[in-house]
Amino acid sequence: YKFNNQREPLMFLDAIYGDKNIYSTPRDMMKWDYALSKDQLFAEKTLEEAFKGYSHERRGTRNYGLGWRLVEMPSGKKIIYHNGWWHGNNTVFSRLPADSTAIIVLGNKFNRSIYQAKKIAGIFKGYGIQSDDDE
């Protein structure tokens, strides 16, 4: 459904799998994060290359790796993430590998406020994202 409770119509891109139409649960996303952090799916060297910035799309901390968006903090810490949306659903999947943490938020009705989940990283030291509670 759309934000105004209208049904999303089917369209030709609905049959593209891998780019869209991947449905999951928070538990499955947690397993995915665990597998990435324990080198169960890919070699450590492969992940190092995937999580390295190549595009330097914006001056400063924002970058794009191989299929992953990156925020590279001056502290040396990284937020590795990829958000998603399609036809009324949207997701936030962020990894804070230095703190063995994943932020996973899945929504079944498109709502831009879901992307505010990035502020959770501000709980951890060295990410430079300030929450209202920071001193």
Language model feature labels by segment:
Residues N4-E135:
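Catalytic loop of the DD-peptidase/beta-lactamase superfamily, centered on the K-T-G motif
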